[in-house]
């Protein structure tokens, strides 16, 4: 006999999956492939509003634009290759790309300080790198369901806020 899923048990499963560190997109794609869990997959999709996905897409374009300018300012062949590598991660909306972008900005600051550059180029490189870091923090605060300290955000009714 098949167990009937209730709204509470579906939400509980979603929360447990999110608490384990999986993204909603990952859960949704995994469940959509299986026949038994399609109801749960649709439930996950309800928690990811379309406007949130669209905002994330536009934010990706801004980060890609900053990334190209950052690579052009540094004039380093390896940095330009890394920029193209990151472009594809950001284009796919993979959260891993944002982590690499954060590290890329830190490396660019270090690169600016340890190379012999004129003062103006040094200042521009540091400013673009800081802008990239602040962009990552902005993304983390606005478009994810976790705070900087790693706690899951909740709304006024003590429900989890489900954002990818």
What are these regions (language model features)?
Residues 2, 20, 24-26, 40, ...:
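Non-transmembrane, interaction-prone segments in cytosolic or luminal domains
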Residues 3-35:
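Short, non-transmembrane cytosolic segments of multipass membrane proteins
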Residues 3-7, 11, 37, 84, ...:
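Short, structured coil/loop segments at alpha-helix boundaries
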Residues 1-4, 56:
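Basic, amphipathic alpha-helix used for nucleic-acid engagement in HTH/winged-helix/SANT-Myb modules
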Residues 29-69:
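Cytosolic juxtamembrane regions of integral membrane proteins
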Residues 54-164:
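Hydrophobic alpha-helical bundles in membrane proteins
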